[in-house]
Amino acid sequence: MPLGHIMRLDLEKIALEYIVPCLHEVGFCYLDNFLGEVVGDCVLERVKQLHYNGALRDGQLAGPRAGVSKRHLRGDQITWIGGNEEGCEAINFLLSLIDRLVLYCGSRLGKYYVKERSKAMVACYPGNGTGYVRHVDNPNGDGRCITCIYYLNKNWDAKLHGGVLRIFPEGKSFVADVEPIFDRLLFFWSDRRNPHEVQPSYATRYAMTVWYFDAEERAEAKKKFRNLTRKTESALAKD
């Protein structure tokens, strides 16, 4: 049986028998050893190159403080990658696999109809106790419905290095602590069901995040943004 066919069957099985049930039951799930060490290493090396070459910039806050850099609230440095850039072949392969997993989830994601996603956000917490305070990725209906994070940290020891992603599932009596270990892929709902935080990191911590958009909510969010832009421009023109 061709390797591609085996991979397709494996991804479809993972999507339908693991990701979909977990998202509906607890709101999140993760897969370990997703790419394997060889391909995972290629992704890690490219991310390190981006970091060392100065491509990363301070992450910005969303919501009322949009566009503001507050290092005590959000301490990561980021850049955005489409996957087609030179030297990003391994990243592109990773993104294609995540795309296929989400595609196989299909109509089983409840009300959501996924047609597009963001670019990949490559993030580095440089240590020194940097983290990201409790927040919701999509608190106000911007279209994001699924958050996917791929971790790249070898020999990570949360007791020494911190950097745990703590999820506070809405309506649940527990919190979920996800250690950012190498080759782990995490999925969770992007809306208010999953407030989360990145606890202080005391070693360099790499991750790559993509967000998948619900088509209807995304279109409505873009419409609201266009209307707001027109109103703002009109108000400025009157001044």
Swiss-Prot record:
Assigned EC number: 1.14.11.-, 1.14.11.29
Any Pfam family: 2OG-FeII_Oxy_3
- Identify the stretch(es) annotated as Required for interaction with ADRB2: 88-104
Sorted keywords for this record are:
Apoptosis, Cytoplasm, Dioxygenase, DNA damage, Iron, Metal-binding, Nucleus, Oxidoreductase, Ubl conjugation, Vitamin C
The molecular function terms of the Gene Ontology recorded here are:
2-oxoglutarate-dependent dioxygenase activity; hypoxia-inducible factor-proline dioxygenase activity; iron ion binding; L-ascorbic acid binding; peptidyl-proline dioxygenase activity
Q: How is the cofactor bound?
A: Binds 1 Fe(2+) ion per subunit.
Q: Which residues bind Fe cation?
A: H135, D137, H196
**Cellular location of this protein?**
Nucleus; Cytoplasm
Task: Please outline how this chain is modified post-translation.
Answer: Ubiquitinated by SIAH1 and/or SIAH2 in response to the unfolded protein response (UPR), leading to its degradation.
Q: What tissue specificity is annotated for this entry?
A: Highly expressed in cardiac and smooth muscle. Also high expression in brain, skeletal muscle and kidney. Low levels in lung.
Top-level class of the enzyme under EC nomenclature? oxidoreductase
User: Which residues belong to any copy of the Fe2OG dioxygenase domain?
Assistant: 116-214
Superkingdom per UniProt: Eukaryota
Q: What does the entry say induces or represses the expression of this protein?
A: Induced by hypoxia. Up-regulated in proliferating myoblasts induced to form differentiated myotubes.
Alphabetically, which GO biological process terms does the record hold? apoptotic process; cellular response to leukemia inhibitory factor; DNA damage response; protein hydroxylation; regulation of cell population proliferation; regulation of neuron apoptotic process
Say what happens when this gene is deleted: Null mice exhibit reduced apoptosis of in sympathetic neurons. However, the sympathoadrenal system appears hypofunctional with reduced target tissue innervation, adrenal medullary secretory capacity, sympathoadrenal responses, and systemic blood pressure. There is an increase in ADRB2 abundance and decrease of ADRB1 abundance in heart.
So where does 2-oxoglutarate get bound? R205
Keyword S-adenosyl-L-methionine part of the UniProt annotation: no
**Cofactor(s) in the UniProt record:** Fe(2+); L-ascorbate
Q: Which InterPro entries match?
A: HIF_prolyl_hydroxylases (IPR051559), Oxoglu/Fe-dep_dioxygenase_dom (IPR005123), Pro_4_hyd_alph (IPR006620), Pro_4_hyd_alph_FE2OG_OXY (IPR044862)
Q: Which reaction does it catalyse?
A: L-prolyl-[protein] + 2-oxoglutarate + O2 = trans-4-hydroxy-L-prolyl-[protein] + succinate + CO2; L-prolyl-[hypoxia-inducible factor alpha subunit] + 2-oxoglutarate + O2 = trans-4-hydroxy-L-prolyl-[hypoxia-inducible factor alpha subunit] + succinate + CO2
Annotated stretches, region: Beta(2)beta(3) 'finger-like' loop = 62-73
Q: What does this protein do?
A: Prolyl hydroxylase that mediates hydroxylation of proline residues in target proteins, such as PKM, TELO2, ATF4 and HIF1A. Target proteins are preferentially recognized via a LXXLAP motif. Cellular oxygen sensor that catalyzes, under normoxic conditions, the post-translational formation of 4-hydroxyproline in hypoxia-inducible factor (HIF) alpha proteins. Hydroxylates a specific proline found in each of the oxygen-dependent degradation (ODD) domains (N-terminal, NODD, and C-terminal, CODD) of HIF1A. Also hydroxylates HIF2A. Has a preference for the CODD site for both HIF1A and HIF2A.
Q: What is known of its domains?
A: The Beta(2)beta(3) 'finger-like' loop domain is important for substrate (HIFs' CODD/NODD) selectivity.
Relate the assembly described in the record.
Interacts with ADRB2; the interaction hydroxylates ADRB2 facilitating its ubiquitination by the VHL-E3 ligase complex. Interacts with PKM; the interaction hydroxylates PKM in hypoxia. Interacts with WDR83; the interaction leads to almost complete elimination of HIF-mediated reporter activity. Interacts with BCL2 (via its BH4 domain); the interaction disrupts the BAX-BCL4 complex inhibiting the anti-apoptotic activity of BCL2. Interacts with LIMD1, WTIP and AJUBA.
This one is known as Prolyl hydroxylase EGLN3
Write the gene name: Egln3
